[in-house]
Amino acid sequence: MSRPEVVNSVAALRAQVSDWRRDGLRVAMVPTMGALHEGHLSLIRIAREKAERCVVSIFVNPTQFAPSEDLDKYPRQLARDLDLLARVKADLAFTPTVGAMYPAGFATRISVGGPSAGLESDFRPTFFEGVATVVAKLFLQATPDCAVFGEKDYQQLCVVRQLCRDLDLPVEIIGAPTIRDAHGLAMSSRNAYLDEAELAVARRLNVILHKAAAALAAGTHQDDATGEANRALIAAGFQKIDYVEARESLTLAPWRRDRAGRVLAAAWLGKTRLIDNVDVPVA
């Protein structure tokens, strides 16, 4: 299996996409920060089903990290990533430098309202501004017909959809199911930070969220269901809970019982912050 072609300039990216367009080919994109795992590969497989050509960006975006977060520690392993991209037959890897994405004098930020309110934004107030800005740039650079994002980062998926609607970006946003290990833990590049004991605790997160979702579907009051989930997470060994909340699936507005919903959570194990979400069936 051969590795995909690698380009690190916007000009080279646009030239390749233009060649595909001249041949009448549909183009999909999967934005990533590298440190690829099976969750990412599942997104690329979906992209390959939706289009004849697939661009995967690998860029650790500094604007979505707060000063106290793990930008410097975030795993960077391009050679391994390219080998994995070969397995799923990605056509092009776009690996820009920070200087190429944010050259001297760069002064624009995109702020998305609506689904960005609360949840992650309460604890990472600059995160979605960084996400929206880099995603808009990537879409303008690659001009994909569609892009695939995982439901594991559910609020991010909703924010990207809002971004494309509001700015008339002609990109179809495809949400992909969360990929989990055999014990139900959502796959994440940050799982590599966990030791064996922490992994055992981390695998309780999905179980506890499913119990909360089932309780909500059965008629339990929101505060009772999410409060019990908070207590269960602490009892399981999580040191701190940032949030456990029920929101409407489409808008992330506060959940109403007659609407499809999601239970979303963020919790800490040592220095590692984990997020996950599960759906709440309509009653």
UniProtKB/Swiss-Prot annotation:
It is found in: Cytoplasm. It comes from the Bacteria. Its main location: cytoplasm. (R)-pantoate binds at Q64, Q156. GO terms for molecular function: ATP binding; pantoate-beta-alanine ligase activity. Gene3D superfamilies: HUPs (3.40.50.620), Pantoate-beta-alanine ligase, C-terminal domain (3.30.1300.10). Pfam families: Pantoate_ligase (PF02569). Keywords: ATP-binding, Cytoplasm, Ligase, Nucleotide-binding, Pantothenate biosynthesis. CDD domains: PanC (cd00560). It catalyses: (R)-pantoate + beta-alanine + ATP = (R)-pantothenate + AMP + diphosphate + H(+). GO terms for cellular component: cytosol. The active site is at H40 (proton donor). ATP binds at residues 33-40, 150-153, 179, 187-190. SUPFAM superfamilies: Nucleotidylyl transferase (SSF52374). GO terms for biological process: pantothenate biosynthetic process. InterPro entries: Cyt_trans-like, Pantoate_ligase, Pantoate_ligase_C, Rossmann-like_a/b/a_fold. The keyword ATP-binding applies. Pathway: Cofactor biosynthesis; (R)-pantothenate biosynthesis; (R)-pantothenate from (R)-pantoate and beta-alanine: step 1/1. Its EC number is 6.3.2.1. Beta-alanine binds at Q64. HAMAP family: PanC. The reaction proceeds by a bi uni uni bi ping pong mechanism. Belongs to the pantothenate synthetase family. Catalyzes the condensation of pantoate with beta-alanine in an ATP-dependent reaction via a pantoyl-adenylate intermediate. Homodimer. This is Pantothenate synthetase. The gene is panC.
